[in-house]
Amino acid sequence: MNRFIDRVVLHLAAGDGGNGCVSVHREKFKPLGGPDGGNGGHGGDIILEVTAQVHTLLDFHFHPHVKAERGANGAGDHRNGARGKDLVLEVPPGTVVLNEKGETLADLTSVGMKFIAAAGGNGGLGNAALASKARKAPGFALIGEPGEAHDLILELKSMADVGLVGFPSAGKSSLISVMSAAKPKIGDYPFTTLQPNLGVVNVGHETFTMADVPGLIPGASEGKGLGLDFLRHIERTSVLVHVVDTATMDPGRDPISDIEALEAELAAYQSALDEDTGLGDLSQRPRIVVLNKADVPEAEELAEFLKEDIEKQFGWPVFIISAVARKGLDPLKYKLLEIVQDARKKRPKEKAESVIIKPKAVDHRTKGQFQIKPDPEVQGGFIITGEKPERWILQTDFENDEAVGYLADRLAKLGIEDGLRKAGAHVGANVTIGGISFEWEPMTTAGDDPILTGRGTDVRLEQTSRISAAERKRASQVRRGLIDELDYGEDQEASRERWEG
């Protein structure tokens, strides 16, 4: 038997971006062809897509760790790395995406809707893309950015039109089994139903869906019984049906007190909801009372006696039925269909939106801005936060001195050096950006404009003269040991001047 899973925690890791390539063009008769390193490929995204073929979150229960493909590294000859393959996870309609704080990020209600759960990292630039007038032959490239990695919570809220609520063993599962083709587990003992059941009810040429959730007891909002965990499946319902057991022999229970107790638990659940379904809160949702088990003579008499009192006290329609004997079902079906059709007309139209892109959090880490604050753990140290500097740190190969110099140029141009001076930083102060700590050595004097240095330049690219064939031949003979490096032949002084430029 398949397990019904309606809540899972996913551990997501999008693909990292590929690294840029450091390469110099090599071709016969084209010396010093310039940099031609390609860019790294973008890391693969993790995407949630709604499909009608999936009805539970069971697969994610057994495989909660998800990682997308990494982007390929760039290569020489201006060849960019391939993009990492996106990983698409299929989810059922009604899936709600929450962050670790429980805040709703997306409500996936329609087939075809997509949500980028984790974005892949950008690929690093190759040295060809880094070349500029001041830096004609970069000897470094940028590292690919890591993909997003975080946990998300998926909750499944059934898209049923009618929700059945009631005490354990009130006959909810029996009712849904005779009104639809659903085959729930049925038994004459409390908490027979341990998971929600869904069924499609046919009324002539019309249909509506019905959800049966595990029974509630007083104190469910405090965790008693099965608690209120399954009530998320009735949040989207157009009408709530109180299924009341009129044949119960439990002391202190009667149909009216049962309804009052259930309403108290629903009110406690409503107070914890923060979602607008467009149908109003649960207290405003239409109600119907179903007095079940009328096949028992004493129960039928009690139902007939209390029907008018219930209608006066609560103002809701009351139906007397027997799910076991299939008695009184047709009037109930038509009344439910009437309410559902009216609710469908009033329900807000869904936006024609096939893709939902998760927005980035808006705070001080906005693009182009940064903050400098004292480091509480290092005396005289500072911590720098900001979208750009933290991203640049991740892109830097700290084993390459030229790449480190390029990072220093960028930070200076962004204004971080001036910011450190204003914050009172001294030469040699410990500065931390994105988990990387280093000693601060200012590149410019106070008040000067930060100008990108000539790191990555190659003086050979500025030369207009080229060595002759004879000179290349002599250099080859020297390397092979056929002649002495200082042997310039006859007229040595003139030759020496020519060889040494």
Curated annotation (Swiss-Prot):
One of its GO terms (cellular component) is cytoplasm. Its EC number is 3.6.5.-. Keywords: Cytoplasm, GTP-binding, Hydrolase, Magnesium, Metal-binding, Nucleotide-binding. The keyword Magnesium applies. One of its GO terms (biological process) is ribosome biogenesis. Residues 2-159 form the Obg domain. It is found in: Cytoplasm. Its main location: cytoplasm. It is an enzyme of class 3 (hydrolase). The keyword GTP-binding applies. One of its GO terms (molecular function) is GTP binding. PANTHER family: DEVELOPMENTALLY REGULATED GTP-BINDING PROTEIN-RELATED, MITOCHONDRIAL RIBOSOME-ASSOCIATED GTPASE 2. Belongs to the TRAFAC class OBG-HflX-like GTPase superfamily. OBG GTPase family. This is GTPase Obg. The gene is obg.
